[in-house]
Regions:
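Histone-fold recognition with a strong bias for associated Lys/Arg-rich disordered tails
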Residues: 1-151
Length: 151
């Protein structure tokens, strides 16, 4: 499956998360979209399953932004145009597609991106969540609970 096919299965909200992730990368003057920007996009989107899960776990946009700034800081120049995903963020997207398949969903939603982020587990986003006292297993369990799915 090439990337065009993969993104065709993304819900409107999941596509919005990717656009918001790019905006967040630009806000921080980063010339890449990393897992931290995906997390910011998921929180900022505000209406999808992932946003609901993160809200249920007490994750707030202002706290995530502060943690990202503390951990990696800001870039030194304004970034314009399209920004690419880091290898780790690409892996999260691949895992999101896989999570959708495992759950037998015909679409890729915000919940799958969040599950991919948790499953990847080693990026800055995972570190940000853990620094906020949110364990990755909690995120997975809460996501499945909100979806009404058992493992």
């Amino acid at each position: 499956m090439d990337s065009r096919d993969r993104f065709n299965k993304f819900t409107e909200r999941a596509r919005k998360v990717l656009a918001l992730a790019q905006e967040e990368a630009q806000r921080f003057q980063h010339n890449y979209i990393g897992t931290e920007h995906l997390l910011l996009g998921l929180v900022r989107e505000g209406e999808g399953v992932a946003a609901k899960v993160l809200t249920n776990l007490g994750v707030q946009l202002s706290d995530v932004r502060r943690a990202v700034e503390f951990i990696i800081g800001r870039g030194d120049r304004i970034v314009e145009g399209e920004i690419g995903l880091t290898p780790r963020a690409k892996k999260v997207i691949e895992l999101a597609v896989d999570e959708a398949k495992l759950l037998k969903h015909q679409y890729i939603g915000t919940e799958h991106i969040l599950l991919g982020l948790v499953r990847e587990g080693g990026g800055i986003a995972a570190g940000v969540l853990e620094s906020m006292g949110v364990k990755l297993e909690q995120v997975r369990a809460e996501t499945l609970k909100v979806l009404g799915t058992k493992e």
